[in-house]
Swiss-Prot record:
Functions as a sorting receptor in the Golgi compartment required for the intracellular sorting and delivery of soluble vacuolar proteins, like carboxypeptidase Y (CPY) and proteinase A. Executes multiple rounds of sorting by cycling between the late Golgi and a prevacuolar endosome-like compartment. It is found in: Golgi apparatus, trans-Golgi network membrane; Prevacuolar compartment membrane. The chain crosses the membrane at residues 1349-1369. The keyword Cytoplasm does not apply. Belongs to the VPS10-related sortilin family. Residues 1-22 form the signal peptide. The keyword Lyase does not apply. Keywords: Glycoprotein, Golgi apparatus, Membrane, Protein transport, Receptor, Repeat, Signal, Transmembrane, Transmembrane helix, Transport. Residues 1370-1456 are cytoplasmic. This is Vacuolar protein sorting/targeting protein 10. It is a single-pass type I membrane protein. SUPFAM superfamilies: Oligoxyloglucan reducing end-specific cellobiohydrolase.
Amino acid sequence: MLHHCVLHIICALFFFLPLGGADSNYAISKLGTASKSQKSLIVNFSKSRNILLLDATGTLLLSQDDGTSWQDAVSNSDPAVVEQLYQHPFEDDIVYAITKESDILVSEDAGLTWFTVTMPPKTVIEAQPFEFNARQSQSVILNAARCESGSIWTGVTCYPFTYYTYDNFRNLDSVHDSIVSCTFAVGTVEFAGQDEDQMLCLIRENDVDLQAPFNQQLISVSKGFESIDYVVFDPYYGSLGTESVVAVGQYLVAAVVDVNSKKLKLHYSTDGQIWVPITFINAPSIGSLTVTRSTSLTLGVDVESTNLKNPVGEFYTISPSDAYAVRRLNDTNRDTRGYVDVIELDYLNNTILANTVANTEDLYKRASRQKELVTKISHDGGFSWTQLERPVDLECEGDDAEDCHLHLHLGITETKFGSLSPDRLPGVIMALGSVGTHLQPLSDSDLFISEDAGRSWYLSLQGPHYYSSSAYGSVFVAVKANENSKLIYYSLDFGREWESLEVEASFRALEIIPPKSLDSLTFLIRAKVKKEESFIAIDFSSILSRECTFDEKKVANGDFELWYPFVMDDTPQCLMGRIEYYLRKKRAVSCVVRNEVPVHSFVEQICTCESKDYECSTYFEPSDHFTCEVNPESLDPLCRVDPDATLQLKPYRILLGNSCVPKKKEEKEKSISMKCPKLDHRKDIHMYHHKIQDTISNIVYMEGTGEPDSTTELLLTSSQKVLFSYDFGEEWLEFDEKKNPSFYGIYPHAFLKDTAFLLTKDRKIYFTNNKGRSFYRLDAPSPPNVVGYPVFNFHSLHPNWVMYMGSENCDDSFYEDCRSVVYLSFDSGASWQKLPDELEYCSWVLGERLLVEDKLLFCNRRRAAADSIGYDLVASTDFFETEASSIRENVLGFLLADEYVVIAALTDDETSLSMHVSVNGRNFSPCIFPQNIQVHSQQAYTILSSKTRALFIHVTLSSRKGAEWGSVLKSNSNGTYFVNVLDKVNRNELGYVDFEKVEGLESIALANVVLNSDEAFNGEEKRLGTLITFNDGIDWERLYLIDAKKHYPHCDSKCSLHFHGFTERSVFSDPTSSSAATGIIFGIGSYSYYLEPYETSQTFISRDGGVHWELIFDSPHQWAFVDSGSLLVAVPSTNKTNILYYSEDEGRSWIAYQFAEDTYLIEDLSTAPSGNSQRILVLAKGKKSSETISFTVDFSHLRSRVCVFDFNDQRDFASWTPAGRDGKPMCLFGHKTAFYRRKPGRDCFIGNTPYVSDTIISNCQCTRMDYECNYNYERIAGGTCRLVSGAEPPLQQEEQCAAEGAIEWMEPTAYKRIPLTTCEGGLVLDESTTHPCPGKEDDYHKIHPGTPVWLIIMLVLLSVFLSTIVGAWVYTKAQSYLVGAIRLGEDPADETVFAKLMTRIESVVTAVPIFFSAAYHLVRSVFVRQDRSMSLDDYDNFEGMEDAAFLEVDDIETSE
């Protein structure tokens, strides 16, 4: 039905107006007032004169007469509100309307009839949801979403959901919910793939701990999802990181964000089966790119070359013949959305228009400056470019006369004004532009037209206009832009001359929509008429009544001509190796084309190749002498595989898409032979510097998931400002510059690497869970505590559970009623609840492997007595809603350390410290130290390590200032019994100890001992010496320096290598080793009698876990592990420098790199804690005392590819097994282990390469190294264990019977097996007599059935008989040896044969009483029943959170 005026649609009016001798019809339809965010949408059709209109109110209208009259498109009493309208790109009679309720209306007859597809509830359909099949119009994919309403905190959560249909939505199937989106492989008419039903889908790998797109893979799907195949871009990552897939011309292009480098990479396919990576030679770091429309043979890609707010790009073309991207044009114009001013013209082969930025240097200085755009054109697919010639009748004035050209508005701005290529009119170009040195704004532009593919131009209309044309250029239409007018212009001769017609109402044009059907000559002009959006329909059929004639055999006789794109002196010329022509309507004739006429090119002649038909090949570049010379850098990917290779290369190649035939014996067709050049890769290192007007207090790296260099860096300055960087310090931005808050600190989440809390002085918390890309501003419940407790405590199982240690009444200077308070949040700080006031400090007990209630809290509770020392340790599992459970009184502190909960407490008389341990969070047992070690109240514990199923603690035995040292003790597996493993170990007055485990090697540690403890106690300066252990503290030895005599010829055998340890490190987080570079250890020290001062020290390295050491620098250096140790970086630490050194061969050789012009004193060499980044921060002291210079050194371009790990082909990695100084593989914890490291010299970076970090080759036979001394035993010279004087052997019945499933216990020996050893067989030192555990007697006797009495009697008789025989034989032999014997005292070297014999026999005879003892116990076990005893509760194992802590009675400690 027709709408009436009350519905804001007026009845269509027709006027027949004779204007300028021309006749035309027009009609105006008003559509009401549109909002700023909405506009009407028009869809017209190629096979009918129907038009669909979606107006701003969501009403869908249909016209069947070219827009003259309108009616409801969908016949419904309650028409749906339509929000989106889409037309099928390959069958334009099919249209889809998306309603506000996300239902789909489908029409297959140009809008005449519709059917409704009702979508499931909660479906959301956003923009561009459809994917179409170019060969099967009924096959459609719908990429939608399902949305769920969440809490106020989470909001609405939407998940991708994809549907597909093979009958145009009559039947609809959904895919698996892990599918992100799908597309058809046959997405373009040009695509040549054979499988018409193939779909390509992005699938989310839910078991991969990465964020999108790194958890997305590309899969190939057959019809109906009957089969699914994963696309493989990388042998290990598959297609992880796939961002999107698009169909462009004959190509499928997949954009992949590399998991390692975080750079964007492209892969293409021409059949949907085989994918080829595109290689960009000497391209900028790819962070954003745009795939442009391809030619028939090539693919265009524009890569963003800057990260400016006003971006600039580089244009490349790719050929399937070699998959190399060749740079064709620099400084292309881009916008922040990714749109690019590079356009290939329709209906014209190899012709490209592009806008370039002429003032790029100015943009670097100030990104907000206006770009100066210069238009260029290429007629050979981008190989050569020229500027546009201005119309001959237009000139520039003054200084601009020499550089006066025509410049055009192209893709970024021009598309809304009109199309560059008129419909089916080869060689004609229309565009708005200006004449001058660069492009002027649209308001100062005119309409220009070229009829010869851009070689010459003429001014068509002055001022900016909207413009369009009908098919084949029968009529051009234009209206003025940006001003009100009543005139509509039209031209029948390609815009040379224009006529005008006038309408009654003044309008302001917004768009011209040309007719799509050859049966129509009606143009629609979308315009504002009296502030109402309207459409003006103009029908030119009355002035173009004659139909054009076309005879394919006699073209010249009709209304078409043969048009040649390149003509000189009226003679067609070779272009791209051929003479070709197009069929084009003659300009001078007035007629309308009603039937299709071919618009493709026709080849008339193939030409012989000339110089212009060649370009430099991939590895060559043009020289100033018009020849192609090799580019050594481009050969790098080839030569790094084999640096000594001889290459066969062709310097020239025929242009892509060129058809010429080479001449015989053409020199440009010949190959040359050349050796790989030697390259200096230092120029592949990128450096950025930034001046920070402050000193640095702390740097936090938020690594998150994915590629190593995708970190966000948060920096806290000494003036309490926070800076952040998204590019590893290339640029530092100040946090919340306008409000300028002061920060207490930065607190990274302990279990979520992309989450952190920033606490301000005004009690605000800035919370991020996306690596600082955005922040939530929250309220802190109170100021932070003032006594040094961790402000935030995080839950390992529930990341949103956060504990806050705050304070009350601590604002005044007297702190009279100042106290600590504890708050809990279950929503990452959005809300807080306060725990009871008497709680001083709390911690979650749940560790990584501790199987306790996740609500379990341990807290220090203040004691009632004001003068009391320590706290009451209490526990709660309901956040103190009920009475807390008391654990122990007089507690000084507690600590979670891997598998242990450790309590330090005062004894009841407050005279000494006691330590208690639990491995289940419930039951605590006292720690029993060796009898000769007592810990008094003035002494202290330092928890050192707990990684190897044993607690290492340092017990202070001397706390005199300047003479602090103590003993390192090691516990059994449940932390209760301790043995002394090293005496006189150095510590400082803060409690830190010179004891450090080697990362990645579980049994190796370094320690410094005080060599002159007595003298140091009496006031002399401590002299330190360094020792190393390879078996977890059992044995210690000196360090071995390679070529020590060569470097230190005057140092005798008393000299050894000593290192400055943990206590002297300025930045405690700086590691001497890294688990990412297993076996590589750095040290600063001296080869001397004892450790020399730091300033005179040297730098050493070990590549084999500390077995051998090598001198690398003659002065102290700082170091960093880059890319998992495949790159080592060092910089002098005591002198000013502008040089850093890097090594690609594990420190065997070093390359100097100058990172600055001036010299600086380096304060820190910093990189991400994981050690697998390829960037480092060099932090230097500035010229001013309160100034820091940050240098970012980027090594990511130093290598050309990612390392590949393959067990069967270890070309990039080599296995390394720790070995002793004799070269034999070392058994660490009872097994030989192979670690994999990148081979020195391999041209690859590790990044996140999924390689096996370590592999157990085989278990070893047990040796003495697999045993440690039992409690109350000490190791003596020779490695044996003896009972400490005055001590008793440990009673282990309770401990052994407490183990899960224990049936028996064994009497102690002097040895016990190391908990982590996996050795098998060999030496057994920890077995002795067994007894049944209480209550397990029946089970015990099933395992050890009683020995028959007759066997016992036989064993006794046999022992007596053997003893008699052996004794008689010894006596006889001794008599013969004694004849003529002479005794020479006690010298063992002169021991007599008899003595030697007796030594051997003694071992035999001694076995007799042992044998009898065994027999006795067998007898006893038959008749005697063991006494019953109490058993301990079983212990569960868990891992805690921290690796070291210092517990001390600060209030009562005094100096001795």
